Amino acid sequence: MSKETFQRNKPHINIGTIGHVDHGKTTLTAAITRTLSGDGLADFRDYSSIDNTPEEKARGITINASHVEYETANRHYAHVDCPGHADYVKNMITGAAQMDGAILVVSATDGAMPQTKEHILLARQVGVPYIVVFLNKIDMISEEDAELVDLVEMELAELLEEKGYKGCPIIRGSALKALEGDAAYIEKVRELMQAVDDNIPTPEREIDKPFLMPIEDVFSISGRGTVVTGRIERGIVKVSDKVQLVGLRDTKETIVTGVEMFRKELPEGRAGENVGLLLRGIGKNDVERGMVVCLPNSVKPHTRFKCAVYVLQKEEGGRHKPFFTGYRPQFFFRTTDVTGVVTLPEGVEMVMPGDNVEFEVQLISPVALEEGMRFAIREGGRTIGAGTISKIIA
């Protein structure tokens, strides 16, 4: 049987289930595939096949995460579900699966629990833009307790709004009942997917964003000038476009006089392509790896930011000992390592391996940074943590 080609006839969205342990994230994931498989839009995946998750590496950190694919009438979804709380923290912080939106699963019998709150906070810090809530285990609530569910909903809406998620749709249902084939609860899963279709917008494609390419290498070609190479992160660059070189030194403006790929001249380079750009009036010593070349004024150099960080455990190849304010590791952004000084928040004495923490960083050189950007923290050539910029200070 020949391998099917990937049909790109629907917009693609990345989503994931988040929420407290045992509130039904994996059962819901299975119930979604069961429900949509009935419409010929998914292959049914049972609980054990999702729960038996492959390991993946993101920035040197092992994450157990299961990826499930399915479609609704309008879209193609890639859905990530993690078994353990630590895996969610790592997955969200490293951006192993960048989520365009999340389904927050909350048990109606428990309401919001510590990990519910932590996952909402993490979602905000790492820039998950939209959340749809599935209030699970509704079948366990007796009629006389029905108004408790209204209280749980109000509390959830408040909690979400506090973290900047206003007006999230809340769908009540039972993942287990839907999985067992109960028609009324299957309808609830359909309602959930309709809410996901309607409330999680299709993200802007990388190609439509302002041009940016992290520089990996610099060459000079005699008689022609300086060429910078790299993979275009977003946008499009054309011959004779004005661009800026940002980071590590003073920002410079120049003009692209040539775009090359595999030694062939092109009229333009697009997001995802590895290209060489010939730059007018730039000497080989004016530019270095780690700078970015971008649409003028679309990104600025910064040195101070707040970040959400996951610190690797010893068993994951991380540090064996805690660190304190004043710690000076290397921060790895795109194609460059820059030393930075850590300042822990008030009341936090030290950070232990395995911690999930927020702190401030002061870099010794400016780098082109943006909120929501991911980075690795290294020490002596090994990764000891991963983070996301939650706020730029200077």
From Swiss-Prot:
| Residue ranges occupied by any tr-type G domain in the UniProt entry | 10-204
Oligomer and partners: Monomer.
Q: Which GO terms describe its molecular function?
A: GTP binding; GTPase activity; translation elongation factor activity
Does the keyword section mention GTP-binding?
A: yes
Binding residues for Mg(2+)? 26
User: What chemistry does it catalyse, as a reaction equation?
Assistant: GTP + H2O = GDP + phosphate + H(+)
Q: Is Magnesium among this UniProt entry's keywords? A: yes
Which gene name belongs to this protein?
tuf
Alphabetized, the UniProt keywords read: Cytoplasm, Elongation factor, GTP-binding, Hydrolase, Magnesium, Metal-binding, Nucleotide-binding, Protein biosynthesis
Protein family according to the UniProt entry: Belongs to the TRAFAC class translation factor GTPase superfamily. Classic translation factor GTPase family. EF-Tu/EF-1A subfamily.
Q: Which SUPFAM superfamilies match?
A: EF-Tu/eEF-1alpha/eIF2-gamma C-terminal domain, P-loop containing nucleoside triphosphate hydrolases, Translation proteins
Instruction: Give the E.C. number(s).
Output: 3.6.5.3
| Chain segments carrying region G5 | 174-176
Q: What is this protein called?
A: Elongation factor Tu
Region (G3): which ranges? Answer: 81-84
